[in-house]
Amino acid sequence: MILNSEQESFRASVGSFLAAKLPISALRTLRGKPVATAYDRDLWGQLAMLGVSSITVPAASGGAEFGWLALGAVAQEIGRRLSPTPLLSSVVLAQGALIQCASPAQVARYLPALLNGDEVWAVAFEEEAHFSPDRLQTAMTPQGLCGSKGMVLDGAAADRLLVTALNESGQWGLLLVDSDTPGINQQASRLMDGRQYVAFEFSEVSESACEWVAGPAPESGWARVLNQAMAILAAEMLGSARELCERTIEHLKEREQFDVKIGSFQALQHRAAHMYSELELSQAAVDAALVAFDSEGVDQCAMASAAKALANECFQLISDESVQMHGGMGVTDELDIGLFLKRSRVCNQLLGDTHWHHLRYANRLGF
């Protein structure tokens, strides 16, 4: 990833903040807290003031306009430390949906609170057990909003929800509603990696409590947001995989068996080289996808799927190999290696597994 001087300086600043305030130990602390706790809200406010929430936002709207490569670099820093933040749920998905799907008046009204960290939002769009973004049954009926949504990331911490729903004409729509509105029931749970998700049930939520997102083309805007979220998640996975690879190589240099460093064993050298080559291949795909979002005339769907599919495979390979190369202690909770492995399994399913992205990539290329 090649960043300009401003982007690199920003990445370094965020990395230093995360190392000091949100190291891997923060994830361990989170696991012991009530399930309603998704992340440290105060620390997220500090990250927002640092500029993390405004990286891709145009300067005219109060953003830094650093571009998607810069946001990808920040996501990699978060991935290196497994830092629990609402970057994906609130910034990329919710804030992105507001910017690309809403009217200028709605953007002007709601965006400032998201940029400065005063509010965090979540998007409720998944209704199936597996990623199926095109399936939609939640609808605005004469009685109100009715339906259910599962796997809403960081949903219990959200001040507002953006909900995909069919309007009374049966057309796709996106509406905004306060998370504590009567008729909204939620069940928070933790995933195997310690992160929070919420299943929401909407039972005749009054239409007067909801606000339809009124941009000129909200459905196509939401499709772009999903592609961007896939690439940013892939960047986070890449950061985790790179950290894991570096830790494992250091272990190979230090661990001794039969009075020699195990890194001198040719079989382990070949496996380490394989990890590194897959890491660089994934890096190239992620960079290409991020650059595509700042470009015209590029198939962003194909690039996002290539990045996510390769990140899935890379992170799973490196997490598996890291556990094996650490031996018996690799499966213990005391070692951070297992936390990365659990994160790899969760990320593999988020926003489409490898098979889903292989199919979409092939379809985009006409196969």
What do these predicted ranges mean?
Residues 66, 132-135, 154-158:
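Short glycine/proline-enriched turns and hinge-like loops at secondary-structure junctions
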Residues 192-218, 367:
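Internal glycine-rich alpha/beta core junctions
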Residues 116-128:
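A short, Trp-centered hydrophobic/proline-enriched beta-strand micro-motif
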Residues 83-105:
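N-terminal glycine-rich flavin-associated loop
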Residues 51, 75-78, 177-181, 206:
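Short Ser/Thr-interspersed hydrophobic loop/turn segments at strand-loop and sheet-helix junctions
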Residues 1-80, 101-104, 113, 117, ...:
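Alpha-helical interface subdomain recognition
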Residues 124, 148-184:
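A short core secondary-structure module
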Residues 138-140:
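A structural signal for short hydrophobic beta-strand segments in well-ordered beta-sheet cores
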